[in-house]
Regions:
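Conserved N-terminal alpha-helix of the aminotransferase class I/II PLP-enzyme fold
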Residues: 30, 35-87, 109-117
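A short acidic, often aromatic-flanked loop/helix-cap motif at beta-alpha or helix-coil junctions
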Residues: 33, 132-136, 322-323
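Glycine-centered tight turns that cap/initiate beta-strands
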Residues: 72, 143, 310-313
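Short glycine-enriched loop/turn motifs at secondary-structure junctions
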Residues: 46, 70-71, 210, 334-336
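Conserved PLP-enzyme active-site core in the AAT-like
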Residues: 9, 13-16, 76-307
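Structured loops at beta-to-helix junctions and adjacent beta-edge loops in soluble globular domains
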Residues: 11, 28-30, 283, 317, ...
Length: 344
C-alpha cells in the first residue's frame, strides 16, 4: 500500500455492523463481555479485545494502526498529547536510578521534562550535542535506558544523523527513541535508519488543522528485550502490577508497546478521547499533500529571507548553504519540513 493510500485506509475495514465507510467515533467508556470468563480473559490479556477506553478504544485503535503503518512499526499507542507520549515512552523503560542520554537540541517542553521533571522521579538526563558522537558514547553507562533525539529539531531545524546514533545505541544495547514530529513519516521513517521507538506530537503536522491535541508512541518491534534482559528485566520477568504478565512471552516483538499501554497509560490515565482520535484521522488523510506544500512554502520563504539585507542567517536544512544539508539529503530526502528560523 502506498504511503498516501495508507494514510487514508490503513487500520480500518468497513464496520461489520453498520457498514460505515468512514471510521466511526466509538464515544463509550466501557464494553460488554460475553460472560464472566470472557471478562476475566480480557483483563488478564489472554485474549484480544476492549476493556475500558482509558486503555483502548476502537476509534483510537484505527489511529494507532494507521500511524504504525506509516512509520513501519509493529504497533502504536495514541495518547492525550505529545508530551504524554514522550513521558510514557520513557516511564515504560526507566525507574529511579536510571538515566537517558539526549541531544541538547530539543523542543522546549521536552527539555523541561528532561531537565526538571524526570529528575524528580529519580531519572537523570545527560545532554550532549547532537553531532558529538564521542560525548554520546561517553555518557552511556550501565544505568542508561535510552538514547533520545529529534529527527528534525524543533525549533532549531537541525537534522540528526539517525544512522550514527542508532549504531551507538546498538553497540551499547539500548533503544534509540526518535521524536519524528517535525519530519513526519512522509519525510523520514526513523526505523529505516536503525531507530527502535518513535514518538509524535500528533497535534502538529499529522493533525494539521490546529483543532486537536494528541500524541503517539510507535514500536519498531526490533529491539531484542530478551537479549538485553539484564538491562531491561521488566520485559522478561513477571510484572506484579498486571497479573504477572511477562511481556516478551505474551506479546513477542510488541512487548514494549504493550507495556506502554498497560503500565503508564493504565496507571496514570493520559488517554486520548475517541473524538480527538477521529479528528486526527481526518488530518492524517491529507498528510502527503500538506507536507509537499509545507516544504515548498518553507523553502521559498527561506530563500527570500537569505536575500534580505537585514537577515544575517537563515536556519533551514534544505538550503544549499545549511550545515545540515547533507544529512537532510540522507535522512529526509533533501526536504526539511515547515519549521525555519532566522537571525537579524
Amino acid at each position: 500500500m502506498k504511503f498516501s493510500t495508507a494514510a487514508i485506509h490503513a487500520g480500518y475495514h468497513s464496520d461489520p455492523t453498520t457498514r460505515a465507510a468512514a471510521v466511526p467515533v466509538y464515544q463509550t467508556t466501557s464494553y460488554t463481555f460475553d460472560d464472566s470468563q470472557h471478562g476475566a480473559d480480557l483483563f488478564n490479556l489472554a485474549v484480544p479485545g476492549n476493556i475500558y477506553t482509558r486503555i483502548m478504544n476502537p476509534t483510537n485503535a484505527v489511529l494507532e494502526a494507521r500511524v504504525a503503518a506509516l512509520e513501519g512499526g509493529v504497533g502504536a499507542l495514541a495518547l492525550a498529547s505529545g508530551m504524554t507520549a514522550i513521558t510514557y515512552a520513557l516511564q515504560a523503560l526507566c525507574s529511579p536510578g536510571s538515566n537517558i542520554v539526549s541531544t541538547s537540541q530539543l523542543y522546549g517542553g521536552t527539555y523541561n521534562l528532561f531537565a526538571h521533571s524526570l529528575p524528580n522521579q529519580g531519572i537523570q538526563c545527560r545532554f550532549v550535542d547532537h553531532d558529538d558522537l564521542e560525548a554520546l558514547e561517553a555518557a552511556i553507562d550501565d544505568n542508561t535506558r535510552a538514547l533520545y533525539c529529534e529527527s528534525i529539531g524543533n525549533p532549531a531545524g537541525n537534522v540528526v544523523d539517525l544512522k550514527r546514533w542508532a549504531e551507538v545505541a546498538e553497540r551499547h544495547g539500548v533503544p534509540l527513541i526518535v521524536d519524528n514530529t517535525v519530519a513526519t513519516p512522509y519525510l523520514c521513517r526513523p526505523f529505516e535508519h536503525g531507530a527502535h521507538i518513535v514518538v509524535h506530537s500528533l497535534t502538529k503536522y499529522i493533525g494539521g488543522h490546529g483543532t486537536t491535541i494528541g500524541g503517539a508512541i510507535v514500536d519498531s518491534g526490533r529491539f531484542d528485550w530478551k537479549k538485553h534482559a539484564r538491562r531491561f528485566p521488566i520485559f522478561s520477568q513477571p510484572d506484579p502490577s498486571y497479573h504477572g504478565v511477562v511481556y516478551t512471552d505474551s506479546f513477542g516483538e510488541a512487548a514494549y508497546i504493550a507495556r506502554c499501554r498497560v503500565v503508564p497509560l493504565r496507571n496514570t490515565g493520559g488517554a486520548l478521547s475517541p473524538f480527538n482520535a477521529f479528528m486526527l484521522l481526518q488530518g492524517l488523510e491529507t498528510l502527503s499533500l500538506r507536507m509537499e506544500r509545507h516544504c515548498s512554502n518553507a523553502l521559498q520563504v527561506a530563500q527570500w529571507l537569505e536575500k534580505h539585507p537585514k537577515v544575517t542567517r537563515v536556519n533551514y536544512a534544505a538550503l544549499p548553504g545549511s550545515p545540515y544539508r547533507e544529512t537532510a539529503e540522507r535522512i529526509c530526502g533533501g526536504r526539511a519540513s515547515g519549521i525555519l528560523s532566522f537571525e537579524l
